[in-house]
């Protein structure tokens, strides 16, 4: 793409120039602006700082650095807030149903402020999971020059010589309930797992999305794996601000960057790093916001050609800080580019192409580390996020399939219409090896809000059942989940999807080799069960949950609210 130089205040001049805008300027003067400032770009800083969660409680210093960078580069910083939900704190409660809703609220906040205030650009700062897609969706809707600053990953905790993170605590709950861990060890893990600020440390959802944003070119190189407490994260925020001012001069906008080829690059990086199932849902929504033709089947196309190169949690050994020390996302991208698995001609926010950004990165990983494997000797030959179909999910669903000892299982259904009763059954020892748990009426409309299921899956793993019990749901999974799990089943139960018609004890097959999710009954029996079915009454009749349930599209389309 050819870039062009334009005036620095192409939008804000609508409220700062001319005699008729004297009242507008008067309000700016009240905040300390001077006449010369009205020729400068007005740049929004969407600040996700919050003391709700450690993921976001370290963001203010990044916002301060970004503000300084904007001013040093000749811009005016206009700060506004965006909300967050702590997935880790809300997990396993009714509050988790607000997590995906917050993605939409965040994107609405950014679009509203940028458009309502005629901002010339926007720098978005976020930490917890939904901050990431929500931020980018808002950037794409507003489509002014924009850059994303990720808050940074958390450092690992430690107990008895073992690295810990938040998922360690969820799994410890299951171990304790199964009699495999003492109360004292559970207490010490609880206290030591999270030593400070930053987002959850494995290749969970926040780190997955930040890595993908770096691959998209909407964030700076190396920025996605930096730790929040480290000075380089603050320096990166300041540099991001200066790069954004240059992008305003060149009129580089989010939709120039987030193209179909760029999304293919991002998904290839997600596969290569062993990223979260949530990335499937979020990139369907991001593509929708960008106006890009991208379907759930495109993930499978990229998966089949992309190896898993990184040994990262939840199913691997290392954390994001280890990936950073090993060369970060640029190292992974250069390996994929050299193998012909990345589009090098995609533009980045720096004004350079992907190939130009990666020019000086070596094609092979360093020999003194084992976080990133050589492309000739990958962790797995194909990606880990598979799209399964079958009579239980004709629109598709998402499974993590790498690292499983048994990639195929058939077992009796154990049916639950809510998460809490499923968790109680696991902790009470009522779920046995070979069972296939079904958690339904938890989709975008049915939940509503499509909650994540880390509490049940963590309990299964802690109880030693992670490899021997299957779990399928029309809800979602945390990025920290691993095991024989299948989520995003679509159509969902509340929309009359076939998952609604599973009976206790029915035979279900999960086949990650044939990409199949099947209820083993006849078509005639399935149709018989549908007779007389009615959608359940809405769980909410007012507020954001009611709006979400009424408007949300299928998970196979990203669970977006504006698919009209």
UniProtKB/Swiss-Prot annotation:
Residue numbers carrying N6-carboxylysine = 130
Question: Which residues does the record give as Mg(2+) binding sites?
Answer: 87, 129-130, 452
Recorded catalytic reaction(s): these are: (2R)-2,3-dihydroxy-3-methylbutanoate = 3-methyl-2-oxobutanoate + H2O; (2R,3R)-2,3-dihydroxy-3-methylpentanoate = (S)-3-methyl-2-oxopentanoate + H2O
Where does the source fall among the domains of life?
Bacteria
Query: GO molecular function, one example?
Result: dihydroxy-acid dehydratase activity
Q: In which pathway does it act?
A: Amino-acid biosynthesis; L-isoleucine biosynthesis; L-isoleucine from 2-oxobutanoate: step 3/4; Amino-acid biosynthesis; L-valine biosynthesis; L-valine from pyruvate: step 3/4
Which BP terms in the Gene Ontology apply to this protein? isoleucine biosynthetic process; L-valine biosynthetic process
EC assignment? 4.2.1.9
Q: Where is the active site?
A: 478 (proton acceptor)
Checking InterPro entries in the record gives: DHAD_IlvD/Edd, Dihydro-acid_dehy_C, DihydroxyA_deHydtase, DiOHA_6PGluconate_deHydtase_CS, ILV_EDD_C, ILV_EDD_N, IlvD/EDD_N
Residues where [2Fe-2S] cluster binds: 55, 128, 200
Explain how, and how many, cofactor molecules are bound. Answer: Binds 1 [2Fe-2S] cluster per subunit. This cluster acts as a Lewis acid cofactor.
**Alphabetized PROSITE patterns for the sequence:** ILVD_EDD_1, ILVD_EDD_2
Q: Which cofactor does it need?
A: [2Fe-2S] cluster; Mg(2+)
Q: Which UniProt keywords apply?
A: 2Fe-2S, Amino-acid biosynthesis, Branched-chain amino acid biosynthesis, Iron, Iron-sulfur, Lyase, Magnesium, Metal-binding
Q: What does this protein do?
A: Functions in the biosynthesis of branched-chain amino acids. Catalyzes the dehydration of (2R,3R)-2,3-dihydroxy-3-methylpentanoate (2,3-dihydroxy-3-methylvalerate) into 2-oxo-3-methylpentanoate (2-oxo-3-methylvalerate) and of (2R)-2,3-dihydroxy-3-methylbutanoate (2,3-dihydroxyisovalerate) into 2-oxo-3-methylbutanoate (2-oxoisovalerate), the penultimate precursor to L-isoleucine and L-valine, respectively.
Assembly and interaction partners = Homodimer.
| Recorded family membership | Belongs to the IlvD/Edd family.
What protein is this chain from?
Dihydroxy-acid dehydratase
Say which species the protein is native to.
Answer: Polaromonas sp. (strain JS666 / ATCC BAA-500)
